[in-house]
């Protein structure tokens, strides 16, 4: 009898594949929109924290109404620095305000997809987006991929560049470091290829080091056979 595939084991939800979210700092979301729609909140950065679940550090901010929130830290933020959230916030690094209020050519990050959703786009370490143009019913923003995306003018964004840039510039060099990078988020690593396995472990396995059968497989194949190009319309390089 064959062995279970990795995706079959993952589907059981054991601790081997479960994210260690109990170690994460917590959710990073903007202050609810109804609290800052008509006013601007002032806060002070209490501390800057490392978050194992993110590629960027987070900052804990205490606001004047007594609430504390985690925000994605921008480059250059300092402990004790004042930040503002609201439509009348000044144009300065770390401040959050609607895209309609941000001038063209400004670097922003943590952009809301829908007004009030708390921030969805451009949150990874070292990333930033660029406000390209503002119109009456939309704001055009260039994302890190180069894509130009239109946002609702009431979507909020934070001014600046996400901290933690340059983390990919230092080479990993040895497998032991890659192991600990994966372990921090409980990633299944290393992940062997099917053709490198024995025939008992994978449909593509065996000593011949080639699949030995078509790599395409039916959408209705049983779980232990459903590997390769699933219900593929075409395979191979486009010519």
UniProtKB/Swiss-Prot annotation:
Annotated GO MF terms: RNA binding; rRNA binding; structural constituent of ribosome
Spans annotated as Disordered: 200-239
Assigned keywords, A-Z: Ribonucleoprotein, Ribosomal protein, RNA-binding, rRNA-binding
Keyword NADP included in the entry's annotation: no
Pfam families membership: Ribosomal_L2 (PF00181), Ribosomal_L2_C (PF03947)
Entry keyword Plastid: no
Composition skew (Basic residues), residue ranges: 222-239
Gene Ontology BP, a term: cytoplasmic translation
Cystines in this chain: none
GO CC annotations on file: cytosolic large ribosomal subunit
Known role: One of the primary rRNA binding proteins. Required for association of the 30S and 50S subunits to form the 70S ribosome, for tRNA binding and peptide bond formation. It has been suggested to have peptidyltransferase activity; this is somewhat controversial. Makes several contacts with the 16S rRNA in the 70S ribosome.
Subunit text: Part of the 50S ribosomal subunit. Forms a bridge to the 30S subunit in the 70S ribosome.
Annotated PANTHER family: LARGE RIBOSOMAL SUBUNIT PROTEIN UL2, RIBOSOMAL PROTEIN L2
HAMAP family according to UniProt: Ribosomal_uL2_A
Family membership: Belongs to the universal ribosomal protein uL2 family.
Name of protein: Large ribosomal subunit protein uL2
């Amino acid at each position: 009898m064959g062995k279970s595939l990795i995706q079959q084991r993952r589907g059981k939800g054991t601790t081997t594949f479960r994210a260690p979210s109990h170690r994460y700092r917590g959710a990073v979301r903007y202050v609810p929109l109804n609290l800052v729609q008509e006013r601007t909140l002032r806060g002070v950065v209490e501390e800057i924290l490392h978050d194992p679940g993110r590629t960027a550090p987070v900052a804990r901010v205490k606001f004047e109404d007594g609430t504390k929130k985690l925000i994605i830290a921008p480059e250059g933020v300092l402990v004790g620095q004042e930040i503002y959230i609201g439509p009348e916030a000044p144009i300065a690094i770390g401040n959050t305000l609607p895209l309609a209020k941000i001038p063209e050519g400004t670097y922003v990050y943590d952009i809301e997809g829908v007004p009030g959703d708390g921030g969805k786009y451009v949150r990874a370490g070292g990333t930033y987006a660029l406000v390209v143009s503002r119109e009456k019913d939309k704001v055009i923003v260039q994302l890190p991929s180069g894509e130009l995306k239109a946002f609702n003018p009431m979507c909020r964004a934070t001014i600046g560049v996400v901290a933690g840039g340059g983390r990919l510039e230092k080479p990993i060099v040895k497998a032991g470091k890659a192991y600990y990078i994966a372990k921090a988020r409980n990633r299944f690593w290393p992940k062997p290829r099917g053709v490198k396995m024995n025939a008992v472990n994978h449909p593509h396995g065996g000593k011949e080091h080639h699949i030995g059968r078509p790599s395409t497989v039916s959408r209705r194949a049983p779980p232990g056979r459903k590997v390769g190009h699933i219900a593929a319309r075409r395979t191979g390089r486009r010519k």
